[in-house]
Regions:
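Double-stranded RNA-binding/processing signature
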Residues: 86, 119
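Phosphate/diphosphate-binding glycine-rich loops and adjacent basic-rich segments that engage nucleotide
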Residues: 91-101, 105-108, 117
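Short gly/ser/thr-rich secondary-structure transition/capping motifs
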Residues: 35, 88-89
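Charge-rich, well-structured scaffold segments of protease-associated domains
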Residues: 1-79, 95, 105, 112, ...
Length: 272
């Protein structure tokens, strides 16, 4: 099932560097040598894109000393070229015949980039649709009520210049079309019907609880802080993030649902 995630990005971002499999392929790997690796480092690693992030009981003065010791002599090198922006999305529908026990399906659409003001709303919407909790819309519709899928999930990835929303599930071959219809039915409900005040409040509190728990993983917190500073030149406190989530209205969610869950703009990849 992991392969379908890579190949779905290839379908969505066809012809763009984002579509390239992060593991590469045997031909490219065989062609690697010292010169090509050094050239890659020179083209992609720059001092203006470096952040030192730490979490825990670390003396800040000692951290500065260590940073200066190992990075103080680094030559200043600024990024010269930006990545080509992806702007030629064409929805695709691909069926791949595979000898698998189940059918595997990916569905999705472009979403908001990391700088977009609707990003936080999209995070909440994704959590409602198929996030970590057992009460997500798709988990209830396909797994709990119908028993059609053991694993169904949605994801939202925000890049610097584009974003991707996707849904994945595996199901028995004979249930594939019914499962797809149920997913599209949930999308339609979210496009047409506002969440009630109580529903929205529960969804907001659930997401905030997940964020609070995630801060207990110190490595993830360290990486999140570093990424935030690199992208936004600041690090929001958990309380600030919570205020942004609490400010989301039913109309905000409805608007984002109509932008991202548009069935005519959905791409689909099926292994069957």
């Amino acid at each position: 099932s992991e392969l379908i995630f890579d190949e779905f990005e290839e379908l969505i971002y066809d012809g763009h560097p984002i579509a390239r499999n992060i593991l590469g392929n045997p031909v490219n790997l065989a062609a690697f040598n010292r010169e090509s690796i050094l050239r890659f480092i020179g083209n992609n690693y720059h001092t203006d894109q470096m952040v030192i992030s730490s979490v825990g009981k670390i003396d800040f003065g000692e951290l500065i000393k260590l940073t200066e010791k190992y990075f103080g002599q680094a030559e200043t090198k600024l990024r010269q070229n930006g990545r080509m922006r992806f702007d030629n999305y064409i929805p695709g529908n691909l069926l791949v015949e595979k000898d698998t026990f189940q059918s595997h399906c990916m569905m999705g659409n472009l979403a908001f980039d990391v700088m977009h003001p609707k990003r936080i709303t999209m995070v909440l919407l994704n959590n409602i649709i198929g996030g970590q909790a057992m009460n997500s819309r798709l988990n209830m519709a396909l797994r709990e009520r119908k028993g059609m899928a053991y694993n169904i999930e949605s994801g939202y990835t925000a890049y610097t210049d584009t974003g991707l929303f996707n849904v994945y599930f595996g199901t028995d071959h004979e249930n594939l079309e019914k499962a797809i219809s149920l997913v599209l039915k949930e999308f339609k409900l979210l496009r047409e019907k506002k969440l009630g005040v109580l529903q929205l409040s529960k969804a907001q509190k659930q997401l905030m609880g997940q964020i609070a728990i995630s801060t207990e993983n110190r490595e993830d917190l360290m990486l999140t802080i570093g990424k935030s500073y690199l992208l936004f030149n600041k690090v929001d406190t958990v309380q600030t993030i919570f205020k942004k989530i609490e400010a989301i209205s039913p109309i905000d969610l409805l608007e984002v649902a109509n932008m991202v869950l548009d069935e005519s703009q959905m791409s689909r990849l099926v292994y069957k």
